[in-house]
């Protein structure tokens, strides 16, 4: 009888143990590394002070234990959890070093099911959770698959106004007079491509988000490869599309076209076939605050980047993405990060603003039956809330330490617009977002957070039932 029960248990084990591959990405400086570090830290400390009341399995005391286990794919770098934790608990505390490529960490979550049928056969189940971190810049490359070289060139050069126009001056000067039909000059093309890469790096340093091709700023082991030595044709209209289309692969324009096609076919498709195809759930982190600080060009650039990124999540049967990869993602969460960098009364506005930015995608996802949500969170809470008296008026404020020099600050950053800001908002410039470093924290206690448990409930809660 005991042997029969053991065999039945083993059979049920195979039936109820679950595997979930969660992808984490975000626009530049959105806090991906801090998010994953904090999420893992909370789960590993469910019996040591973790605050996760919104995760139903914890609230109902059904999550029995969590441990790290070896990842299945030995070819993917390990996520630097321990290193990130050491930085957060350091003296002085620091934000974790951002990751620059794909990395992964794997957890086993042991839980009691509240499913009556499963409970009848088995006391506990296990969820194997694989958390995969990858750069948002790579996701932003996906729309290139729906373009040819000349249409992509038009889009890129069409952005070169305002500050982008200033920052691209060297590239435009170097590409001046380049003959599309002349025999390919590889050295000159490499030099001009380097100038385009410098321009993209400058855009990223200045807080812009729409950067293509994404691998140019995060090349990894592809640094110096000809696949990363192309750039948009600078003056499509001057030469005319028909003439440029005639350029064979041994000409300047032809070689750039060939490299663009190779990049799309091998690099972009390769990433999505090897990684994205295997994701079950996806969270996209967005920092809405820094662009509000930087001005209308930075904010509109973030909006453009999100619009492009959303093209990656159009799940309709007829879309390019569906035809190529048949993705299985069934839940998509957008999170406005750094909720601790604004006062509590502005949290709802943060979420509302992000909802406005992704409204079209939300409608598409709902139509396709994809479960999608939007929330505000702070992976690691860096400030405390309080009330200050200003000329007899009590207003909410934040206390923390400034990121640049650690100086203590008490500030009211201002109001976050609940809708896409118009010219009146920019004219007033009443919002002043300050970057904070992490608080000094007790190494024996889990990291403080805001609504990280709400994100966990949406992303994995149904798998722990």
Swiss-Prot record:
Activity modulation notes: Alternates between an inactive form bound to GDP and an active form bound to GTP. Likely activated by a guanine nucleotide-exchange factor (GEF).
GTP-binding listed as a keyword: yes
Residues that bear N6-acetyllysine: 249
Keywords: Acetylation, GTP-binding, Hydrolase, Nucleotide-binding
Coiled-coil residue windows: none
InterPro entries: YcjX-like
Record: residues binding GTP: 28, 31-34, 95, 99-100, 338, 340-341, 380
E.C. number: 3.6.5.2
One Gene Ontology term of the molecular function aspect: GTP binding
Claim: Acetylation is one of the keywords in the record: yes
UniProt binding sites for GDP: 31-34, 95, 99, 338, 340-341, 380
Cofactor(s) of this protein: Mg(2+)
Entry's family note: To H.influenzae HI_1637.
Role, per record: Binds GTP and GDP. Has intrinsic GTPase activity. Does not hydrolyze ATP. May act as a transducer of stress responses.
UniProt subunit comment: Monomer in solution.
UniProt name for this protein: Ras-like GTPase YcjX
Gene: ycjX
